[in-house]
Swiss-Prot record:
Active site annotation, chain numbering: S188 (schiff-base intermediate with substrate)
Native species: Ruegeria pomeroyi (strain ATCC 700808 / DSM 15171 / DSS-3) (Silicibacter pomeroyi)
Enzyme class: lyase
Encoding gene, per UniProt annotation: psd
Function in brief: Catalyzes the formation of phosphatidylethanolamine (PtdEtn) from phosphatidylserine (PtdSer).
Entry membrane topology: Peripheral membrane protein
Protein name: Phosphatidylserine decarboxylase proenzyme
Family membership: Belongs to the phosphatidylserine decarboxylase family. PSD-A subfamily.
PTM notes: Is synthesized initially as an inactive proenzyme. Formation of the active enzyme involves a self-maturation process in which the active site pyruvoyl group is generated from an internal serine residue via an autocatalytic post-translational modification. Two non-identical subunits are generated from the proenzyme in this reaction, and the pyruvate is formed at the N-terminus of the alpha chain, which is derived from the carboxyl end of the proenzyme.
Amino acid sequence: MKMRDTFLKPMHPEGRKFVGIFAAITVILFLIWSVLGWIGVGLTVWCYYFFRDPERVTPAREGLIVSPADGIVSMIEKSVPPAELGMPDQALTRISVFMSVFNCHVNRAPIAGRIAAIAYRPGKFFNASLDKASADNERNSLCIEMADGRQIAVVQIAGLVARRIVCFSSTGDTLRTGERFGLIRFGSRLDVYLPEGVEPMVDLGQTMIAGETVLADLQ
């Protein structure tokens, strides 16, 4: 029952064409050799699983910053937000969440607020778990401004396998905490830059659930 429930989660619309392509190839493989066909079935099921989009229960209390992605906390360090966002040139606490190809890759807003800026920058495709991925890899950055004027930066970073960053939101949009705003296909990383003076409430290696796990408390 538990395994069935895991694989029968709703699929994000971004995954439909990929599942369709895998399914079409599977039919062709069955015509060639049944063994190849069953391998295709397995890959099609995996593709469906990759693009799963389960509902999440986001904490209701205001001031809680939640994880924007499923995965593992790979880094916690001081760093300056991406220059293209136009935020102050000041080192802030950066929490990096690494997503493997087995994690759900739908990205969610870490806090409620208005998107003050979105900036895409092309780049390399180093392993997203490496520190240099923040500076060198393809990325899409968002600056979310909260009601009190403080800002949080969220950065979608492409990885070794991921070659497509998707962002559903636009500058000026208002997001709720835990609301879907994008995804990255096939392995990647999300960086969150906390406001000055806000301390992280997570540890290295800790498992994150997007929209649920609390990263920090503004209060």
